[in-house]
Every structure is written in structure tokens, then in C-alpha cells.
């Protein structure tokens, strides 16, 4: 067992109209854990999500703060609609910090279970400040109202291994794994300024941990600089009204309309449920907007080799729900299952590749002059983990 450095107990707040009314502050350097009130002013002026992130970041930093300054914060928040199950896109977490790439505030929008589970555990936002002396893990049990900070020296470094281990560690059984979400970054974040964060969710159909990424601005680099190995949250008992919205009847009515529109129109317009955001590859190529060979051109005659249809026909599992939160009929979090790696430290293994998103297909494919879907997916996996 890892050495426990700090424990903290709290009474989980009941969600009222999308808010718990509390935020969680953790200083990973001196191990302080504090509760802060979410005021009516904050809700009125900043709403939640990125608004709350920027509010807390504004009060944490100075004009002299750099990305690797101890006072720089990583702030995470799900807005007042976070975690509702009536329509798509509500599993989002908004993450902000001073970026190592720009030296100004950056925000990144990520799917998965962490934001909703954090909110239902009683927290509208999470602030992480300071720097730990050694790698640590932070675990929040939202049902028991218990927070643990412990040493993390014995854990794998790469996210696909780390999240699998932590999901199994904190889940009581196979059925309980859907109640656990892990935030982590991989070994690359120690060496580059563009490191990103993986937000996990457990896929009970595939029986594997999957990821969405907060990939903008180098958030994973800050995470590793603070010596945070992983954040883990656990909450079970999700229901359709856990968010306790102000007007559930209207929410249900709007949700039904929303689901019908996606069902009727998606195949005609975007094919998000078949390919996700990579549906735009050939559209961008057609309009001379596909970044190719380091933006020398806006398209290429070989672009068809990484077209959406190639990924749909040859790589991405079809006919299975791919939402990254309950009730998301957009179902755009596509996956290449049992994908055989040919290179790198995991060569010969079959892995789950989350993607490709458009940014991966364009950035790791066309923009590098690579029009090989196998190579794009392989790079996708290694960039993620």
C-alpha cells in the first residue's frame, strides 16, 4: 500500500439547480485541503465551467506568474448542466491554467466522467495549486465524503496502464468500475510543453478504460511539473435527476427533441455517430483547408487514404454506443478496438485507440505528409498514453 500523506472528510453537498455550492481547493505542496463557498455572485456572473475556472485562476496568480510557478493553478469545473442525462454533451469538464505554450490563461474542454462525478461528489470546481516534493495521487470518494492524498511512486507512468490499474483498485467489482474516473498524463509531459490530460471513463461493453483528452495548452505538462500522478474520483448512484435541475419537465422535453434531431439528421449531415469529428477530413480537403505538409497546402490527392470512410470500414467499431457520458446519443467518441501496434515500447500488443479525432487525423496525418491510417492511429495511441 502507498503511504497516505493526508486525509480529509467532508459532508457531500446536495446538488440544487445544478450547483453544489462548494468548490475544493488542494495545495499539493503543503497538503492543505479547503472548502470554498460558491457565491450567488459567481453563479450570476460566471455561471460555471470555464467561468468558474477563470474566476479562481484570477485570484490565484499575479502578472508575474509563469506556467511553472507554484501559484499557477490547474482548475477544473463542470457547469450547472454538467452530468444531466437528458441530452448530449453534458459530461464535459472545463480545465484552465497559465499555459506553458503561451504564458497566458488557456482553457480546454474534455469529455468523460470526471467532471460530473466531481460535481455529484459535492464540488462545483477543483483548484490544484503548489508543487509536491514527489509524485502523489489524489482520491475523492464522493459517497463517503473522503479525500486521500498518497504517494504514487509505485504506479505506471503511461496513462493506459495507470488508469486501468487505478480503476480496478478503487472499484469494488466489475460493475463498480463505471463509477470511477481518472485524470492523468503520460511520460511525454515530462519532456514537452504540449503535454495533455487524459480523462477516463470505463466502457462496460468493451470492458476497458477509455479516454477523452484535455489537449490544449500544455495542461499535462503543468500536471507533471506539480508531481501529480493522477486524480481519481468515485461516485455511484447516478440518476436522471441527480443534478436536481430547476425545471426537469422542460429539460426532458428539450432532450427528446434534441435526440430526435440527431437521430434524423446525423447520417445526412455529419456522421458523428459513425466517425466523430474526423467526419470533416474530406470536407476540409475539398475546400483547401486541410493542413498538409506543415501547412504548405490545404489538401492533397492522397487525402482519400485517410478519409472517414476508410476509418469506418476498416478500423472503427460500429453499431455500439460510443457516448462518453450517460444519455449522449451523439455517441461521437469512436474507438479502434484490438488495434495491433507495430512500433514503440508496446509493439506487438493490441490496444484500444480512442479516435481519431479530426485534429489527430489532420495533425498526425496530412500535416506530416502521412496518409496511412494505421500510422495515424498508432501515433494517436502514443500521443494519448
Per-region residue spans from a language model:
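Intrinsically disordered, low-complexity segments enriched in small residues
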Residues: 1-109, 113-385
Amino acid at each position: 500500500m502507498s503511504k497516505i500523506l493526508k486525509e480529509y472528510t467532508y459532508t457531500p453537498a446536495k446538488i440544487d439547480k445544478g450547483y453544489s455550492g462548494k468548490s475544493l481547493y488542494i495545495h499539493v505542496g503543503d497538503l492543505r485541503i479547503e472548502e470554498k463557498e460558491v457565491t450567488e455572485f459567481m453563479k450570476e456572473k460566471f455561471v460555471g465551467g470555464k467561468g468558474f475556472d477563470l474566476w479562481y485562476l484570477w485570484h490565484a496568480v499575479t502578472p508575474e506568474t509563469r506556467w511553472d510557478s507554484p501559484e499557477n493553478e490547474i482548475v477544473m469545473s463542470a457547469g450547472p448542466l454538467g452530468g444531466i442525462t437528458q441530452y448530449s454533451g453534458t459530461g464535459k469538464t472545463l480545465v484552465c491554467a497559465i499555459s506553458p505554450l503561451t504564458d497566458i490563461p488557456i482553457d480546454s474542454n474534455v469529455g468523460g466522467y470526471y467532471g460530473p462525478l466531481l460535481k455529484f461528489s459535492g464540488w462545483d470546481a477543483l483548484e490544484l495549486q503548489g508543487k509536491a516534493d514527489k509524485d502523489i495521487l489524489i482520491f475523492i470518494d464522493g459517497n463517503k465524503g473522503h479525500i486521500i492524498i498518497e504517494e504514487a511512486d509505485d504506479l505506471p507512468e503511461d496513462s493506459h496502464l495507470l488508469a486501468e490499474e487505478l480503476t480496478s483498485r478503487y472499484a469494488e467489482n466489475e460493475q463498480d468500475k463505471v463509477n470511477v474516473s481518472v485524470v492523468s498524463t503520460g511520460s511525454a509531459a515530462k519532456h514537452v510543453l504540449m503535454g495533455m490530460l487524459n480523462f477516463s471513463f470505463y466502457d462496460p461493453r468493451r470492458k476497458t478504460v477509455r479516454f477523452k483528452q484535455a489537449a490544449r495548452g500544455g495542461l499535462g505538462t503543468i500536471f507533471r511539473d506539480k508531481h501529480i500522478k493522477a486524480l481519481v474520483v468515485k461516485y455511484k448512484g447516478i440518476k436522471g435527476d441527480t443534478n436536481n435541475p430547476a425545471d426537469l419537465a422542460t429539460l426532458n422535453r428539450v432532450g427528446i427533441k434534441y435526440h430526435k434531431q440527431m437521430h434524423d439528421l446525423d447520417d445526412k449531415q455529419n456522421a458523428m455517430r459513425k466517425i466523430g469529428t474526423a467526419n470533416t477530413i474530406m470536407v476540409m480537403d475539398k475546400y483547401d483547408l486541410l493542413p498538409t505538409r506543415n501547412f504548405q497546402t490545404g489538401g492533397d490527392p492522397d487525402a482519400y487514404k485517410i478519409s472517414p470512410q476508410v476509418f469506418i470500414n476498416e478500423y472503427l467499431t460500429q453499431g455500439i454506443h460510443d457516448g462518453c457520458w450517460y444519455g449522449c446519443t451523439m455517441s461521437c467518441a469512436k474507438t479502434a478496438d484490438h488495434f495491433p501496434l507495430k512500433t514503440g515500447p508496446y509493439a506487438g500488443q493490441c490496444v484500444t485507440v480512442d479516435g481519431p479525432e479530426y485534429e489527430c487525423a489532420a495533425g498526425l496525418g496530412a500535416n506530416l505528409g502521412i496518409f496511412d491510417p494505421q500510422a495515424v492511429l498508432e501515433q494517436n495511441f502514443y500521443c494519448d498514453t
